[in-house]
Every structure is written in structure tokens, then in C-alpha cells.
From Swiss-Prot:
Origin species: Dictyostelium discoideum
Gene3D superfamilies on file: DNA helicase RuvA subunit, C-terminal domain, Nascent polypeptide-associated complex domain
Similarity annotation: Belongs to the NAC-alpha family.
All copies of domain NAC-A/B, residue ranges: 10-75
Protein's name in the database: Nascent polypeptide-associated complex subunit alpha
Length: 160
């Protein structure tokens, strides 16, 4: 075996493993990934973990290299990149004639202009509608409930 294949065990890890044996923790096989979800959408991911279970089966000890994945910040970064013009174009059907296209644009514009947004930014409503496929009314209600927080609104609409 090459030196790079041999795993170095630290003194602290060695003591921890001895203590786990004394407590009766048994190794659990066939676990390839451990994901722990924390508040605010933060995920702690351990790839190739060593997992030990207590005899009661309710407590686990996980060894391995971990990484953090913040879903909320990724979603928040993606939301400003959304282009409202692309959203409106995607929502409209393909025109069969130029005249029909102009008429449908006027109808959509009138419908959007006549809708009561209740103090919510129409662009925010369009972005959330695109991400969640929810109705305009539901999006406005959710944005009001979340105090115009786009990320919270998207998460609430997609989890319900």
C-alpha cells in the first residue's frame, strides 16, 4: 500500500473510538451520505461517513468530512437573475399572427395593470409566480404575509 492510501488517525479520534466501544455503539454499514437539515435551509452534508448507532437506535455518531450547503442563499441569488420580460414572454402563448399578438399583449397588460397588488411590487409578484407556478392572488397574499421576502414566499408556496 502507498502512504497516501493509509488513513492517519489522530490521538483524539482514537480516544473517541475507544469511548464509543465502551458505550456499546455499533458501526452501521451501507450508509453513503448523511444530510442534516438545520434552520434557515442550511444543510450539513457528510459524504462517505462512518456511522455508529447506540443500542437504543435513537442516537447516531457520524464521522467524516462535512460541507455546508445553504439552499436559501442559493435561491436568493437565483431570484434577482430572473428577467421579468422573459417571464411575461414565456407566459404568453405563441402568436399566430402579428395582430393577435399585439391584442393579447394589450389584454395581458390591462389585466396586470387592473390587478390590485396591495402595495406589493409587481416585478416581485412575477418572479415568485415564475418560480412557484402559483396564481397571482396567492403570490400577493404570500408576499404580504412574508413582508415582501421573496425567498420566504417561494419556500412557503413550494412547500405547501
Amino acid at each position: 500500500m502507498a502512504d497516501s492510501d493509509v488513513k492517519k488517525v489522530t490521538k483524539g479520534e482514537k480516544k473517541t473510538r475507544e469511548a464509543m466501544k465502551k458505550l456499546g455503539l455499533a458501526p452501521v454499514s451501507d450508509i453513503f451520505r448523511v444530510t442534516i437539515k438545520q434552520k434557515e435551509g442550511v444543510l450539513v452534508v457528510v459524504a462517505e461517513p462512518e456511522v455508529y448507532a447506540s443500542p437504543s437506535g435513537e442516537t447516531y455518531v457520524v464521522f467524516g468530512d462535512h460541507s455546508f450547503d445553504d439552499i436559501a442563499s442559493r435561491l436568493q441569488k437565483a431570484v434577482p437573475k430572473a428577467n421579468v420580460d422573459d417571464i411575461v414572454k414565456a407566459a404568453m402563448p405563441a402568436p399566430t399572427a402579428v395582430k393577435e399578438s399585439e391584442e393579447s399583449e394589450e389584454i395581458v397588460a390591462q389585466a396586470v395593470d387592473s390587478f390590485d397588488y396591495k402595495g406589493v411590487n409587481p416585478k416581485d409578484v412575477e418572479v415568485v409566480m415564475k418560480e412557484t407556478k402559483a396564481s397571482r392572488e396567492k403570490v400577493v397574499e404570500t408576499l404580504i404575509a412574508t413582508k415582501n421576502d421573496l425567498v420566504s414566499a417561494v419556500l412557503e408556496l413550494t412547500t405547501n
